[in-house]
Amino acid sequence: MGLLFALGSVVLVSAAQLLLKWAMIQLPDISQLPQFLSSLSQFPLPTAALFLGLLAYALSMLCWLLALKRLPLSRAYPLLSLSYLLVWLAALWLPGLNEVFRWGKLAGAGLIVSGLLLICWPAAKTR
């Protein structure tokens, strides 16, 4: 059950990143705070994405706390690196996020997967 909570946290935090990125592309620059706040009512879809992203972050934290209760930290924490892969792949695939494929990023993703496998692979039983 702890693994499900950890993976749920990864999926939710990845969705949060994508929603927040898309919302911030659509909305005015946040450094102009009065304009940004007044524009929230004028852009219902980006505003909904912004608040859904924040909600996804909160739910991700709840799942993470439940995962930590049930899993050793050495097993749970490496799973967070999956969010880097999910966000990168989804940002390449989803329209409007303006991500560009680069071979170096693919190599980095491969290193993340390799590291995750090295950390999480069950140790061989010794006799």
From Swiss-Prot:
Biological pathway: Bacterial outer membrane biogenesis; lipopolysaccharide biosynthesis
Segments on the Cytoplasmic side according to the record's topology features: 1-2, 69-76, 124-127
Disulfide bonds listed in the record: none
Segments traversing the membrane: 3-23, 48-68, 77-97, 103-123
Ranges facing Periplasmic side: 24-47, 98-102
Keyword Transmembrane helix among UniProt keywords: yes
Gene Ontology biological process terms in this record: lipid A biosynthetic process; lipopolysaccharide biosynthetic process
Keywords annotated in UniProt: Cell inner membrane, Cell membrane, Lipid A biosynthesis, Lipid biosynthesis, Lipid metabolism, Lipopolysaccharide biosynthesis, Membrane, Transmembrane, Transmembrane helix, Transport
Gene3D superfamilies (alphabetical): 1.10.3730.20
UniProt-recorded Gene Ontology molecular function terms: carbohydrate derivative transmembrane transporter activity
GO cellular component terms attached to this protein's record: plasma membrane
Top-level lineage group: Bacteria
Topological type in the membrane: Multi-pass membrane protein
Location relative to the cell: Cell inner membrane
Keyword Membrane appears in the UniProt entry: yes
HAMAP family associated with the record: Flippase_ArnF
Its biological purpose: Translocates 4-amino-4-deoxy-L-arabinose-phosphoundecaprenol (alpha-L-Ara4N-phosphoundecaprenol) from the cytoplasmic to the periplasmic side of the inner membrane.
Assembly mode: Heterodimer of ArnE and ArnF.
Similarity annotation: Belongs to the ArnF family.
Protein name: Probable 4-amino-4-deoxy-L-arabinose-phosphoundecaprenol flippase subunit ArnF
